[in-house]
Regions:
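Intrinsically disordered, compositionally biased repeat/linker segments
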Residues: 1-43
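Collagenous Gly-X-Y triple-helix signature in extracellular proteins
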Residues: 43-272
């Protein structure tokens, strides 16, 4: 549903409407007018992403507008465990498929920060997310093990976490207990996100087209990062020289509006 305004003698579609509330511009979600004593909707800006169920998928186009990539809602709000601060209070969206594949390094590694997996995620939004959405990505403080703490597995969290707009999920965030790592060698890098279940077994919630990386490294062993197999089961032996998939996660404000389109009886949700 669209409304138009006249500009230079031409009708131009209005994508968003704002009203002033307490001196602040607030975006209008829906607009109504009275017709024969009945309220008729003349504008629908969409529904806030917070109103959608976990597991719902959303399409976001790339900067060219020629491709649409799909993301699944896996958490709303700040995850539990006390390891996140208010920067995580948003809608967590996880790429539904593998976006790319890479190995990590030919040499011993000391963590996630600054290595191939992290660097790829840092550069991901610029080439894969349209600017109107990329500009709204939240910078989240992620629980992580600093390179200098590699041998002790001390987790930096809250305001001391790793600041990122795009990142890989940790194994813990996807439902793995730390003691399920090799000999317990997994740091507590976060808490389980609400969409996932506690299991190391195959699950559709983690299924993908191929094996893919997490941001969790085996404690005190720079040869391995934890990963998941294509069927969603836990892989504790992702060797740094092997090439595996990448499934980025982004976080948007909970009031982000979603446009829903019905096509042949099916609903598709888009973030513009």
């Amino acid at each position: 549903m669209a409304i138009y305004t006249g500009i230079g003698g031409s009708a131009k579609s209005v994508s968003k409407i704002y009203i002033g509330v307490g001196g602040t511009a607030r975006q209008v979600h829906k607009g109504y007018i009275g017709v024969d004593g009945v309220a008729k909707k003349f504008y629908d800006g969409g529904n806030p992403i917070s109103s959608f169920a976990l597991g719902t998928e959303f399409g976001i186009s790339d900067p060219s507008g020629n491709k649409t990539y799909w993301y699944k809602l896996i958490h709303k709000g700040v995850p539990g465990g006390g390891l996140y601060d208010s920067t995580a209070n948003g809608a967590w969206l996880w790429r539904t498929d593998i976006a790319a594949s890479t190995s990590i390094s030919n040499n011993y590694i000391y963590g996630y920060e600054g290595w191939a997996l992290d660097n790829w995620c840092v550069n991901y939004p610029g080439g894969n997310i349209k600017s109107s959405v990329a500009n709204r990505l939240m910078t989240v403080h992620l629980p992580y093990v600093k390179q200098s703490d590699d041998s002790s597995a001390n987790v930096s969290s809250g305001s001391n976490g790793l600041s990122r707009k795009c990142f890989l999920l940790s194994a813990v965030e996807m439902g793995i207990y730390t003691w399920q790592g090799i000999d317990g060698l997994m740091a507590q890098e976060g808490a389980k996100l609400d969409y996932f279940d506690y299991t190391t077994a195959a699950t559709d919630k983690r299924k993908a087209g191929d094996e893919y990386w997490t941001r969790s490294k085996r404690t005190n062993n720079g040869n391995y990062m934890y990963a998941f197999y294509a069927d969603g089961s836990f892989c504790n032996a992702g060797y740094r020289e092997d090439s595996h998939g990448l499934r980025p996660c982004i976080v948007l404000p909970l009031n982000t509006l979603v446009r829903t389109v019905t096509f042949w009886g099916a609903e598709f949700n888009y973030i513009d």
